[in-house]
């Protein structure tokens, strides 16, 4: 009895000592423990998703792939699979399972190694949310105390739901929703028992047991899960026997991107990061953009095709690499495919290796091990590249171009395969809605994998003749008209700084003598533009350009401005052309229409300032767009008067008046009216002539009329000195687009080519806006305007139509006449007298015309 007594006393002392030690340990660790109450408001890290305007996924950003699901959305069999495998006594313990610990310890003692884990689901949750992955005794102790606290705070179902959404399951998949998508391309409710068991087996070692890494290990682990489910009575013997014999059909499933718009998606990502920091990638934001699949894909296709066409006509630069030389032992297929898999793809261009070649045909292997045939049709274009201005002879047989062992690039053209090469030239396209500035399409380069530099928004390039419509607008705002006569004869002026004569020339160097301003713009006459610049003044012209949104620091105050020496981005150019297309309003380009949080709540919605060409004052108001909504004294108080429209109004004054009126009325906010609507119509009409010309002369953009087969379009070519940059910018109903092409290396020019006869409809001669940039503009605009009814140019109030003499710009007095538009009060009043000849003085200098 005495022994029993002492034993009981010792036991009680041990228990008290143990309890005291545990309490002391708890008191020591408690200040270091995180507040588990935050679990009530825990936010799952959900990636940012970017959508098109019509709701299609175009990009996803975030390190963790997660698709949150509620417990009732998860099949019961899947829940049981996790419980059976990870914590069979989950509904019986209070965060820590002594039975499980004892069982794991016993197995470890008798087997000599730890083959069973003792962590409950609650402990795993505590570790995943609050603790580091380090394997230390202190972390394990903290894990135990946190698990107990969590059990006191949350219900079992809440713990289980949080766990099944937080657990890491390999390949950046967190939670069962993401794992179902990553491995099987399904939602959780579509999974089979086989697939559920595979996923339930992953928490122990996601990198080792996933079926994409090792199918054998995945099968073995799946069978362990099925055995545990059978032991717990969750499945029948028949289900077990059937499922364990099934194959695991797993593949990596990336997020289902409907279509790609990488340059615009990157712009969205940067904007979201600027707004929300790192949480942009974790808080489940859904961003809706302004682009649509049809329009964006048309833009990307137009740019890529045009770049490839330019690249082909300039010749083949040779194979990308030589894997083995002719006469050496060929590589085996595995070595070839491993090498090709390590190479990127660029748009339609795929890496390939030539495995055989004869005069009629070559065979090339792709990265997936398949082979394609390259006939003479697919290599005929590949005359040797010698320089940007010189190409070699057209090849006569396939082996003139291809040899066994070469690593090349190929692309599919219809049913055939063609030799290709990664282009060195690059291009950009920006398309916006001129009425509100919404970006309709944006392409920042040939391929985002090739270069992430966004030429649409970041490349400052000289604009060449693309600047002329803006400068002619300035000239007409100061008194010139579309019928004003300017002398198209050579100019020579001494440049003291350069120590030589400055002699701007037309391209081509052809001169017509006195011509009307409309023809000067339509034929892109450089000397005519210089004369107009001199007539209005360089400083006036440079300052006027700022009305179109062009930054002052990029505008030179010299006569070379007339030839486009200023540098702007394609986005800035498109914005400027929108002013001419929308009646004179400077809209702001924008590309995010709406941002939603992870619950679907709208936290941002775009409210762009819009154009209103029907309104007759610079600052408008109200929903009806009528000037009599307010009393006269209200209009005088906050609006720019009608008389002020035709004078230079500082931009801040326009903005302040606009904001004041909006604050007063709660009205739609309108974009600044930077040029009056009649003037905008005149330059819009002139851009139309740039495409369609007149009897006796052809506009530089004539190909657009041929390609689009509609007359409600207008545009302007642009080519810089030495053809280093080529542009085409213009409008159609509801759309303005600017295209640029050139080399990132500013030292290179676009050169010229000779016709080879090997390329159907090959462009030849000197590269420039009409040949190098316009084909992309034409192709894109044709696709965008397909099915859009023609909308004839309709003169706004304030425009009068007068019959003028073509050769003098005066009132017509017989034949050789055309109808011309004028702002009321600026039309000619004198009859044409042909004997006088010209209104330009003999020394080539422009007369005072106003």
What positions do the PLM features span?
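Short, well-structured active-site flanking segments
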Residues: 91-101, 174-177, 236-239, 476-496, ...
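Conserved catalytic neighborhood of penicillin-recognizing serine enzymes
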Residues: 110-135, 186-189, 256-257, 435, ...
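A penicillin-recognizing enzyme superfamily signal
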Residues: 78, 289, 293-296, 300-302, ...
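Mid-domain, small-residue-enriched loop/turn segments at the edges of structured enzyme/sensor domains
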Residues: 500-506, 537-575
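Non-catalytic, structured segments within soluble enzyme domains
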Residues: 22, 27, 111-366, 532, ...
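Active-site SXXK
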Residues: 82-83, 229, 299, 359, ...
